[in-house]
Each structure stands twice: as structure tokens, then as C-alpha cells.
UniProtKB/Swiss-Prot annotation:
The gene is psbB. PSII is composed of 1 copy each of membrane proteins PsbA, PsbB, PsbC, PsbD, PsbE, PsbF, PsbH, PsbI, PsbJ, PsbK, PsbL, PsbM, PsbT, PsbX, PsbY, PsbZ, Psb30/Ycf12, at least 3 peripheral proteins of the oxygen-evolving complex and a large number of cofactors. It forms dimeric complexes. Pfam families: PSII (PF00421). This is Photosystem II CP47 reaction center protein. GO terms for cellular component: chloroplast thylakoid membrane; photosystem II. Binds multiple chlorophylls. PSII binds additional chlorophylls, carotenoids and specific lipids. It is found in: Plastid, Chloroplast thylakoid membrane.
């Protein structure tokens, strides 16, 4: 037929049977990718250290989504929380991956069947004998079924009534686990960080979808609306479907990047705003202050800080620290975290405690500046030693570690002090293994960054697709030069402009 690549889909334009076939094949490809990707990730995933080497540090993309929905155990005998399991059953990571691959195979066979047997009676209009689809009726059916699925997910799966619940954690991503969630019907249900809103919104949206589906099944659209929105044209369906998809993609790009109850930091990593606002740093200092108020020593107070909380307060886990064309997981960047060295406290020779200014997100390099509790600069690592007034050597800065592997160790050697001051710019200090993965030391983004980038990009492309196909279906008569609703019989070749009696051709 010699169609250009951008017009190949016209082959299913007036062929409902094969239109169905290609959509089933598309579902087969999507499901097959999901199952295969899950098996690949499970093959390379190391579950041994859920605190310092969680799934998001390893660049896992589909495992977090399975975990979010309640899958925590593997046929390999491990659990995502770090424990061991003996009988994970069918609802394990491998079980779900296998189910997707089996479903993909069934869809593949169904697609072939529908491609071969395309001329089914159900697709032909009994009045005209031509292939046709009752699109408003199909819309009602799909809306009803989507409503049932949405309601069922919210009322049964999320609430634990018949299902596992979903992943729920505390605001600092320390105590996450899969648990049943009660619907939040008050104003708190609109807080994007309240898990109960997920249950209540799915129940409400599902109920609305069921009612709307029944409405569209029982009420036919008015003729003027039907014609005005071109409801008989399959390209109208394409245009509105693309609109639904790009809108959803923009929404999830937002909930992923800014964070929400649906994107827990234990599964997808922290957000950049938690670094920008010193979110974990404030919580760490609050806990240390409480410890000191309970008459604990500084060393004891810092030793009670969970390693998991300290690890979140490290710039290498900021998804905005990745870069264009920096492929690979976070572990391929700065390395695999092995242990927390402890919190360094810097002091000058007069005993003042000094704080290292932290590197802002979008800086690759940043001057090492130490300030006191009032924000006055007391020491730095100068660019020009000849003009320096606040160098570590001149001010006599020392460092002592509290908590972690170097608990109680202090250094006064200027070279060592400067080394730890530089590392303090990046948050809490961790020992990182770069040898195992041949990590290059350049920060990478987390799956949170990749997901956001992908969905925001495709949402933009699909937005233009919606405009394109919407314009094509609304203005088809203008583009073609033929009114699709023209009832009068048109004799081609009689007029210079088709159907325009004022342009009758002269008889030769």
C-alpha cells in the first residue's frame, strides 16, 4: 500500500475488528514489558541492606510500584524489610511478574485471533451492513467497568477488606510497611500526604464512574451534541483518550516530584525539596536536642539517630543532583553506602561550635564556609591563601565525631579537618564503596527523577497529540473539502469545487 510511517494507523480506521486486535497486542506488549522488567530487576536487586542500599539507590523502577501495592516477599526467601520468609505464595514479586508474562501471552494469542477473524457480526451495523461501532454505548460500558475497578481498589484492596492494603510510612520514611488504610472522609482526605485519601478518593471516584457509566448506557447524546463533538468518529475517541492520558501523566509527574502518600520516600527516595528545606536535618537536630534534654551526652544523643534518617540527609540522595545523560543508578554514581561515619562537630580555638554551609541543589561546587550559631562567618577554606583571614589553620578549627563509626574520634590536623568540612557540605558523612560497581563519583538521579522526567515529557508530547487529533476530527470537513453530513448526492467531476453548484464546469 506504500503508506508513510506516520499514516500507517489508517489501516484500522474503518475496521473495528482489527482496531481491537492492535489494542490487545499493545496490552500484550505493555504487560510483557512489565513482567520482564520485574524479572530483570529481581535478578540484579540486592535485598541485603534495606537501610543503606534500598531499592531506589539501586535504580529499581517497577519493584517500588509492586511494593507500594502490597507485595513485599520474594521466592528467593527475602522480604523487602530485610527479614526472611518461608512461603511467600503466589502474591510475591516473582508471582506477579509471572502473571504479567502469562497475561501477555494470552493477549498475544487473542490479538492474532482478532486480526484473523476481524469481520465479526457484532461490528457491523444491521441497517447498513457496514462496519460501525456505537461509540457512546462503548464509552458507557468502559466508564462503568473503570468505575467498578476504581471502587473495588479503594473499598477492598486499600482498606484491607479483601487485599493487603498499601505501603504506609511516617513523615520521615523510617517505619514503612504494608498495612490496611481506613478511608479519610474529612478535610484531611484532601491532604496529598494522608494515605486515607487514597481509599476515600477511589471509593468516591469509582461510585461517580459507575453512576456516569450507567447514565451513558441509558441516555443517548442529543443529536446536535453528537454531531458537534463528532461522536461518531473514532478519531474523537483517540483525541479524548490522549487527553485523559496526558492529564494523568501531568498529575503523577507532580505527585512524584513534589512527593505524596502515593510515592513513599522508602520506595522512591527522598524529594529534592527535603534537601532544600533541611527537612531531615531539622528532625535530626530535634531528636538530638530532646536527647540532651533527657541528660544524655552528646555522643549518646547522636548515637540514637537511626542510620536510615541520617542517610536521607545526604545530598547524594537528592533526585535533582542527577544530570542529563547520566544513566544508571545512584549506586553507579557516588557508590554503595557502607556506613555512617557519624556527625562531625567543628569548633574554633575559642570553643565556638561551627556549622558548615550546605551545598544548594543546583551547585556542582561550593565554597567551604563555616559559620557560628548566629550565622557569622568564622572559618573557610580560602581560594587564595595569601589573602586569607579565616583559614582552618589560622582559626585553629578542630572536628569531633558523635555517633556512627567514628564516635568519639577527634582531629586537629588541618588537612583532615578540611577534608571533613568539604564532605559536610554534602550533608551527613558516609563511607561509600566505589570499587564494587566501578562507580565514577558523579551523582545520579533516583527513580523519582526518571519517572518525573519521563511522564512530564510524554505528557507534553501527548498534549500536542490531543490538539492534533482533536483538530483533525472537529475540522475534518474543512480539511477534506467535503461536508461529512452532506445529504445531497454529489456527482464528482461536475463541479470544480466538490458540491459547490456555483463552480459548474463548462461543457467542452
Amino acid at each position: 500500500m506504500g503508506l508513510p510511517w506516520y499514516r500507517v494507523h489508517t489501516v484500522v480506521l474503518n475496521d473495528p475488528g482489527r482496531l481491537l486486535a492492535v489494542h490487545i497486542m499493545h496490552t500484550a506488549l505493555v504487560s510483557g514489558w512489565a513482567g520482564s522488567m520485574a524479572l530483570y530487576e529481581l535478578a540484579v536487586f540486592d535485598p541485603s541492606d534495606p537501610v543503606l542500599d534500598p531499592m531506589w539507590r539501586q535504580g529499581m523502577f517497577v519493584i517500588p510500584f509492586m511494593t507500594r501495592l502490597g507485595i513485599t516477599d520474594s521466592w528467593g526467601g527475602w522480604s523487602i524489610s530485610g527479614g526472611t520468609v518461608t512461603n511467600p505464595g503466589i502474591w510475591s514479586y516473582e508471582g506477579v511478574a509471572g502473571a504479567h508474562i502469562v497475561f501477555s501471552g494470552l493477549c498475544f494469542l487473542a490479538a492474532i485471533w482478532h486480526w484473523v477473524y476481524w469481520d465479526l457480526e457484532i461490528f457491523s451495523d444491521e441497517r447498513t451492513g457496514k462496519p460501525s461501532l456505537d461509540l457512546p454505548k462503548i464509552f458507557g460500558i468502559h466508564l462503568f467497568l473503570a468505575g467498578v475497578a476504581c471502587f473495588g481498589f479503594g473499598a477492598f484492596h486499600v482498606t484491607g477488606l479483601y487485599g493487603p492494603g498499601i505501603w504506609v510510612s511516617d513523615p520521615y520514611g523510617l517505619t514503612g510497611k504494608v498495612q490496611a488504610v481506613n478511608p479519610a472522609w474529612g478535610a484531611e482526605g484532601f491532604d496529598p500526604f494522608v494515605p486515607g485519601g487514597i481509599a476515600s478518593h477511589h471509593i468516591a471516584a469509582g461510585t461517580l464512574g459507575i453512576l456516569a457509566g450507567l447514565f451513558h448506557l441509558s441516555v443517548r447524546p442529543p443529536q446536535r451534541l453528537y454531531k458537534g463533538l463528532r461522536m461518531g468518529n473514532i478519531e474523537t475517541v483517540l483525541s479524548s483518550s490522549i487527553a485523559a492520558v496526558f492529564f494523568a501523566a501531568f498529575v503523577v509527574a507532580g505527585t512524584m516530584w513534589y512527593g505524596s502518600a502515593t510515592t513513599p520516600i522508602e520506595l522512591f527516595g527522598p524529594t529534592r525539596y527535603q534537601w532544600d528545606q533541611g527537612y531531615f536535618q531539622q528532625e535530626i537536630y530535634r531528636r538530638v536536642s530532646n536527647g540532651l534534654a533527657e541528660n544524655l551526652s552528646l555522643s549518646e544523643a547522636w548515637s540514637k539517630i537511626p542510620e536510615k534518617l541520617a542517610f536521607y540527609d545526604y545530598i547524594g540522595n537528592n533526585p535533582a543532583k542527577g544530570g542529563l545523560f547520566r544513566a544508571g543508578s545512584m549506586d553507579n554514581g557516588d557508590g554503595i553506602a557502607v556506613g555512617w561515619l557519624g556527625h562531625p562537630v567543628f569548633r574554633d580555638k575559642e570553643g565556638r561550635e561551627l556549622f558548615v554551609r550546605r551545598m544548594p541543589t543546583f551547585f556542582e561546587t561550593f565554597p567551604v564556609v563555616l559559620v557560628d550559631e548566629e550565622g557569622i562567618v568564622r572559618a573557610d577554606v580560602p581560594f587564595r591563601r595569601a589573602e586569607s583571614k579565616y583559614s582552618v589553620e589560622q582559626v585553629g578549627v578542630t572536628v569531633e565525631f558523635y555517633g556512627g563509626e567514628l564516635n568519639g574520634v577527634s582531629y586537629s590536623d588541618p588537612a583532615t579537618v578540611k577534608k571533613y568540612a568539604r564532605r559536610s557540605q554534602l550533608g551527613e558523612i558516609f563511607e561509600l564503596d566505589r570499587a564494587t560497581l566501578k562507580s565514577d563519583g558523579v551523582f545520579r538521579s533516583s527513580p523519582r527523577g526518571w519517572f518525573t522526567f519521563g511522564h512530564a515529557t510524554f505528557a507534553l508530547l501527548f498534549f500536542f497529540g490531543h490538539i492534533w487529533h482533536g483538530a483533525r476530527t472537529l475540522f475534518r470537513d474543512v480539511f477534506a473539502g467535503i461536508d461529512p453530513d452532506l445529504d445531497a448526492q454529489v456527482e464528482f467531476g461536475t463541479f470544480q469545487k466538490v458540491g459547490d453548484p456555483t463552480t459548474r464546469k463548462q461543457a467542452v
